[in-house]
UniProtKB/Swiss-Prot annotation:
This is tRNA (guanine-N(1)-)-methyltransferase. It is an enzyme of class 2 (transferase). It is found in: Cytoplasm. Belongs to the RNA methyltransferase TrmD family. It comes from Staphylococcus saprophyticus subsp. saprophyticus (strain ATCC 15305 / DSM 20229 / NCIMB 8711 / NCTC 7292 / S-41). Its EC number is 2.1.1.228. InterPro entries: Alpha/beta_knot_MTases, tRNA_m1G_MeTrfase_C_sf, tRNA_m1G_MeTrfase_TrmD, tRNA_m1G_MTases_N, tRNA_MeTrfase_TRMD/TRM10. SUPFAM superfamilies: alpha/beta knot (SSF75217). GO terms for cellular component: cytosol. Keywords: Cytoplasm, Methyltransferase, S-adenosyl-L-methionine, Transferase, tRNA processing. PANTHER family: TRNA (GUANINE-N(1)-)-METHYLTRANSFERASE (PTHR46417:SF1). Specifically methylates guanosine-37 in various tRNAs.
Length: 245
């Protein structure tokens, strides 16, 4: 996979791209990353990348020329996805991460200032993505978050493929509780089932915990999750137990 970042602050990416999973993916030649400072593609002697909005208003708007020129400098493929980081976009989800991980090439356009000239959005972008209902100073941090979420899904990047298959949201549910040594700590014990050695019982317990944890912490996810009769029974038993308690 190749990922390009169009940004005014390429140095922001240095630490993130050279640590942990992202560095491992590059070392394995599974990922190529490139930062493009689109200020270098401005068309006036002052390297101006923004200007006042037509019609008046607050803030500055990113000019089209630097970003169009920067995009033309990038070698693209037939399935290149051009991501515009903006509050108006679709909320980023694990499903989107899964989809983008299938692409050979992803370009992130990371803006600053008040916004983008609309022609950038209309003629260059394939996807508009938001990290949530809040506003950040620029698109660099969201692009880094998305890159981490996407790259860890590439086959062979993680040491254990099962690691991301068990992640929260991968199947529409939150992850089950995890425990490690010691068996007891300050009066708190690990559930006996995890020490039983019975993998069928352990799998059943973990799945029940995923259902219950999602019901308690993110019930909105269950509205989209196709629950079986057995899974609905798990929730109903939990509700009855709460009433008794």
């Amino acid at each position: 996979m190749k990922i390009d970042f169009l940004t005014l602050f390429p140095e922001m990416f240095n630490g993130v791209l050279n640590q942990s999973i992202l560095k491992r993916a590059q070392d394995k030649n599974m990922l190529t990353v490139n930062t493009v400072d689109f200020r270098h593609f401005a068309e006036n002697k002052h390297n101006q990348v923004d200007d006042y909005p037509f019609g008046g208003g607050q803030g500055m708007v990113l000019k089209p020329e630097p970003i169009f020129n920067a995009m033309e400098s990038i070698e693209k493929t037939d399935d290149t996805r051009v991501i515009l980081m903006c509050p108006q976009g679709k909320p980023f989800t694990q499903a989107i991460a899964n989809e983008l991980s299938q692409s050979e090439h992803v370009v992130f356009i990371c803006g600053h200032y008040e916004g983008y000239d609309e022609r950038i959005r209309e003629h260059l972008v394939t996807d508009e993505i938001s990290m949530g209902d809040y506003v950040l100073t620029g698109g660099e941090l969201p692009a880094m978050v998305m890159t981490d979420a996407i790259v860890r899904l590439l086959p062979g990047v993680l040491g254990n493929q099962q690691s991301h298959e068990d992640d929260s949201f991968q199947d529409g549910l939150l992850e089950f509780p995890q425990y490690t040594r010691p068996r007891e700590y300050k009066g708190m014990s690990v559930p006996d089932v995890l020490l039983s050695g019975n993998h069928a019982h352990i799998d059943r317990w973990r799945h029940e915990q995923k259902i219950l944890r999602t019901f308690v912490k993110r019930p909105d996810l269950l509205e989209r999750y196709p629950m079986t009769v057995e899974e609905k029974d798990i929730v109903e038993r939990y509700k009855k137990q709460l009433k008794k308690d």
